[in-house]
């Protein structure tokens, strides 16, 4: 229609353009001048019509889906066939002849490969191999049964005189027609069953049968066609043996071609790390090459491209990038959808041309009855045999759906068009019968299969992603069943699947996957990775900011009690005691506004950032540039990681420079006492916490190697990141890779977000006023064993403070710091006359508190002080602490 319409529109323009050239030119006249406009339709006719057909098909799908009620009742394939009939009628009325037909060459070489590749590539491999025995039974035995029974029944119908005498066909002709009309079409099955949404087992059995019966269909068609051309009198016994052997050659040869190209495709994508942009192209080219190679060798092309897609997906998906996977998915789906739409439209258009078919009612009705009857009978017989060996048998409802789902489509129409009229005189009758069968199965059965499924209450497919718990249990049961088969000595399906997985893990995966992809294919790490993703999503939903260690509560993390929760003061508070061992000097009660401001401050500091550059002036032919969202996410991640890794850079904590020279450790903070200097000089570290039990070794690349790396690579591997290699300290020292000057220092903390002004204010300067000291008489409280010593010392200290001399109120002056390198002298306490009493922490506690305040001044919240220690620990000094005293003044209350 489009060609005729454009031709009609082109007539006046072409005539106007050709009018000057139609005049005879005299020898003396000059040549015509420059033409402003010329109509060149014939030069762009073929690609223009292809583009228009695809555009019309796409617009038709859009129009169909505008009405949800129509698409819910009528399958899309039926609507496309009806649209093709309408367009074919319009073209026939305008041009007086059928301009467009579904040519077999166009169908087999250009329209069918995308559909089969999409089906094989995205086929659920586990479900396919679980039901492989049933699929092969229905595909091979069922197709042979349908072909021979249908052909023999039609021949018997002709011998009975129910077929018109003008249908000149013998037994071989009817067997040839039965071989092409008995095969279930994958295009029709896929178009109808995807809209019905039957359960996965039914779908994979019917669809797998439609894919794998291609080998049987091709062999039967070629063998019967050869016998027809040879003549029944010239067929020898060896020809029958060759026909049986060709069944194995065509099927196994097609599968072998597909597996070879799948191996090449997986191996090629292993080396495309630096040229990501061509990964989708390689997938389509090598898959199409497998189809053409099998077609060239007269093998099963459908089986070849199916095995190619099924065999390469695991390795290709692991090698290519995420963007390439998305491109392959949507491009493959788009090509398959367009090809399927064009096929059904051309089927409708081809049916309009009455010059290529002849009608015979007996043949048409007999064919419809026989294909339905023998299909149902074959399914029942084969299912009865299969149920003897299946753990989950197929019930009668499943058998009804399988019998009713044997749809015929464009494959049968293309094969009947390829028949030679000189060799098969009844070709026109076979064409008409094939068109009726295709229309009946696609339209009538397609319209009624959904109500039939609802009426029979067939189990539908459940579109939900399995949980991690379900996947773990499935793997567990697989290993248990394989172990049971191994114990009883029965090598069944689970045993061979386990052997194949071991072979794949040991050889194929290491050969066809790059190392980074092979590492992340481990199932345990995969589950652990998804657990981390789930925890991260849960953390973000709770309002946390990126990579913050404060307020982090994840579902998969065990609860940890903080230091404040295990202190003696909190135990007293929970038990209702009136004693306050820390003298209430660090109890800071902030207002709700201050707490809200602090939370908002940390949230904004973690979530907001200043972009480094607004525009990124880079272009590469090998990678796809990042969009704004991806670039923003990367900058946020890099900014947070840089801020948190500054502690490693400053302290050089256990850094093993494996590729560069070890750098000497810089001297830390100046020590203010001689003991600290002496301990630092001797390299002795005392009082290290639990963080120092296992050191973390960072593998850092040198700056020279970073400069020598390829600067043109603008997109890194999706699964690459910062790699932390954790080793024991003893292992690193034994290897001898760390210089002696590179000391091992305590593990740095993760830098928390910057504190607010309210959090920087010291607790005892929060304006709470003078607080009275309360001493509880209940000194026999139940205290944990590890806190008994601190409890006794604290109670004794408070009792001594609660009973000073009555005529004096001692005051303690701040002691000046001692010079470095000298011993700490015993300084007597001066007791001036002052109504207020004062108290000094012991030197060890004062130095520890001073050290902690200096090293962690940026902490948003101060931990509660530990219980007061006795004077007997004055000589104990922690490394790196000062000798200055920390003075705390308080008023004695009248309620002592």
UniProtKB/Swiss-Prot annotation:
Q: Where does the record place it?
A: Cell membrane; Recycling endosome membrane; Cell projection, Dendritic spine membrane; Synaptic cell membrane
Which Gene Ontology molecular-function terms are recorded?
Answer: arrestin family protein binding; potassium:proton antiporter activity; sodium:proton antiporter activity
* Required for interaction with ARRB2: annotated segments: 576-721
Q: In which tissues is it expressed?
A: Mainly expressed in brain. Expressed in neurons of the central and peripheral nervous system. Expressed also in testis, spleen, and skeletal muscle.
Consult the record and explain the modifications the protein receives after translation.
Answer: Phosphorylated by PRKAA2; promotes its accumulation at the cell surface. Phosphorylated by CSNK2A1 in a manner favoring its beta-arrestin binding and endocytosis.
The keyword Membrane belongs to this UniProt entry's keyword annotation? yes
What Pfam families does UniProt report for this protein, alphabetically? Na_H_Exchanger
Q: Which residues lie on this side of the membrane: Extracellular?
A: 67-73, 125-134, 195-200, 268-276, 353-360, 420-428
- Give the GO terms filed under biological process for this record: monoatomic ion transport; potassium ion transmembrane transport; regulation of intracellular pH; sodium ion import across plasma membrane; sodium ion transmembrane transport
Q: What is the effect of changing residue 714 to A?
A: Abolishes SLC9A5 phosphorylation by CSNK2A1 and abolishes CSNK2A1-mediated binding of ARRB2
Q: What is the membrane topology noted in the UniProt record heading this document?
A: Multi-pass membrane protein
Instruction: Spell out the Basic residues composition-biased ranges.
Output: 660-672
As for family, the record states:
Belongs to the monovalent cation:proton antiporter 1 (CPA1) transporter (TC 2.A.36) family.
User: This protein is called what?
Assistant: Sodium/hydrogen exchanger 5
Q: Which gene encodes it?
A: SLC9A5
